[in-house]
């Protein structure tokens, strides 16, 4: 198997950063080569034998070559050697153009040489010749939005923020900046923007609901037969503070109030693009109040 994952996402995985959609690779004797190389790199120290293992795998697998390049770039397991890191990346771009993103990062940050934003922009743009590399697309969007290493191109930035949004948290903020500057969108782009907005809000609300569920457990306010609480958050364009109302009660007013309090400081991170006749928008969020985990609920459903 020589399936190539997004190289910037691979770097984020190695460093422990969160990126939506990243594979969660775990160390095991039966790992696929890409996963094996990443798991070795994530170790606090790398043995000489493991270095040789990665060196061998790097001759066959692009991502293992990138890992070896990162080892030289950061001096992890081997002596730091920027030319070797750059050489490894350059040797792989013919097999996978997304590796250009590593060369872009080196040029942008002045690794192994002076900062060169013109070269960084060129490398990043080369890295997104094939779609599906969200982190690299986000970098291109930033360079185009702010005119780094070349002329400003807001429509180009819009294109790449829209394509990177499923994998990068900051894309929605970039889209909001472009909207505030009056950048126009096609009907299809508006629909895509609204999908991104809804996905982001649902993700944030799900995390908020999980936090509230933990609070209920800690304060012993859960009961096995308690009903879920559903709230509605209604927004008005230009006003980030939602109007929050109770849609479904748990049957316990104290629990309901605790849930409502948990949403009290929530703010919409952006706003959707509404048709002229629509003045408000809303979304619902549900908090489980039975004190069970998702696995426990699933097991109960299976046993029925």
PLM segments and residue spans:
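N-terminal leader/linker segments that initiate helical-solenoid repeat arrays
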Residues: 17-67
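Hydrophobic face of amphipathic alpha-helices that form TPR/SEL1-like repeat modules
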Residues: 40, 65-74, 100-109, 123, ...
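Glycine-centered coil turns and helix-coil junctions that link the paired helices
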Residues: 43, 60-61, 72-78, 95, ...
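Hydrophobic/aromatic packing residues within the alpha-helices of TPR/SEL1-like helical repeat arrays
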Residues: 52-55, 89, 124, 161
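Alpha-helical linker/edge segments of TPR/alpha-solenoid repeat scaffolds
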Residues: 112-115, 149-152, 179-206
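TPR/TPR-like (Sel1-like) alpha-helical repeat modules
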Residues: 152-169
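Conserved "boundary/linchpin" sites in short secondary-structure elements
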Residues: 172-180, 188-192, 210-214, 236, ...
């Amino acid at each position: 198997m020589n399936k190539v994952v997004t190289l910037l996402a691979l770097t984020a995985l190695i460093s422990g950063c969160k990126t939506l959609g990243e594979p969660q690779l775990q160390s095991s004797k039966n790992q696929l080569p890409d996963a094996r190389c990443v798991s070795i790199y994530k170790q606090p120290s790398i043995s000489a034998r493991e270095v040789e293992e990665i060196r061998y795998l790097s001759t066959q697998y692009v991502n293992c070559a990138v890992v070896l390049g990162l080892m030289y770039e950061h001096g992890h397991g081997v002596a730091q050697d920027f030319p070797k890191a750059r050489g490894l990346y350059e040797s792989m771009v013919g097999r996978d153009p997304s590796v250009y993103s590593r060369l872009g990062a080196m040029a942008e940050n002045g690794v192994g040489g002076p900062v060169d934003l013109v070269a960084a922009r060129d490398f990043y743009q080369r890295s997104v010749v094939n779609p599906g590399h969200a982190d690299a697309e986000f970098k291109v969007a930033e360079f185009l939005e702010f005119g780094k290493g070349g002329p400003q191109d807001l429509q180009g930035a819009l294109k790449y923020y829209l394509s990177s949004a499923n994998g990068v948290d900051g894309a929605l903020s970039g889209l909001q900046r472009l909207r505030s500057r009056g950048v126009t969108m096609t009907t299809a782009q508006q629909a895509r923007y609204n999908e991104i907005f809804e996905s982001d809000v649902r993700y944030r609300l799900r995390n908020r609901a999980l936090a509230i569920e933990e609070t209920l457990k800690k304060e012993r306010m859960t009961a096995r037969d308690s009903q879920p609480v559903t709230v509605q958050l209604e927004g008005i364009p230009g006003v980030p503070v939602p109007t929050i109302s109770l849609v479904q009660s748990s049957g316990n007013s104290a629990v309901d109030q605790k849930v409502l309090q948990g949403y009290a400081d929530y703010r919409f991170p952006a706003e959707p693009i509404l048709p002229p006749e629509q003045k408000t928008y809303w979304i619902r969020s549900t908090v489980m109040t039975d004190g069970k985990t998702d696995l426990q609920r699933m097991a109960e459903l299976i046993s029925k």
